[in-house]
Amino acid sequence: MKAGDAAREVVKMSGKRSLVYGVGVNDWVGNISVGGKMIMEYYLWQDMLKRCFSEKYKQKKPTYKDVTCSKEWLSMTSFIEDVSQMKGYGVKGWQLDKDILVKGNKLYSKDTCCFVPSEVNNLLTKRDNARGEYPVGVHFDKYAGKFMAKLKINGKTKFLGRFNSPEEAFFAYKTAKEAYIKVVAQKWKDLLDEWVFQALMSYEVAIDD
């Protein structure tokens, strides 16, 4: 079923006509703004819909090309009912993530999403437009004629070495990145959902990440 058709079904059930990005149904009971500012619940839902249904956003973020959400989450009320039960909901600096529990996931839904600190979320963000022709973490040093591996840690670039092939450089990056992910996971262990922690501890960096 297409998102638009699903939205019309939800509209019919709720009796509301307020569509967000042409599909989202604002069936929230109460005001969505207080003192001229959107409530946190509305902003969170709207931001999720933007990533799923805004063509302008997808042009800027190609990795979201095929991303969508479950039929249930077209309803603001259903969305908030689900995410409010997730550990980390409403915590300042935490973000809704769709990729950690299911790597490569394209669906925002109750079973595929979780909340994580921005440090964790940014750690796993794909940046295809910044990668270039080589694997993630790899750059060619034209002066040395070798491939360099680099990893950003706490905003600073760590040099991992020079190698004869992009594959060797990537393996160095992969090893360092997976180790760093585990360090960050341990840092947040007591606050993360157990499933999220385990997903981070077993996370594998792929050459096309």
Can you annotate each of these PLM segments?
Residues 21, 120, 128, 180-209:
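Extended, polar beta-sheet/loop recognition surfaces of beta-rich domains
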Residues 79, 138, 149, 163-177:
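An aromatic-rich alpha-helical recognition segment common to small helix-rich domains
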Residues 65-71, 156-167:
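A short, exposed loop/beta-hairpin motif centered on an aromatic-Gly-Thr core
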Residues 1-57, 62:
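GGW-centered surface loops in extracellular recognition modules
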Residues 34-38, 46-54, 60-146, 150-151:
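Short, cationic Gly/His-enriched loop motifs
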Residues 24, 97-99, 136-137, 161, ...:
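Glycine-centered small-residue hotspots that permit tight backbone geometry or close packing
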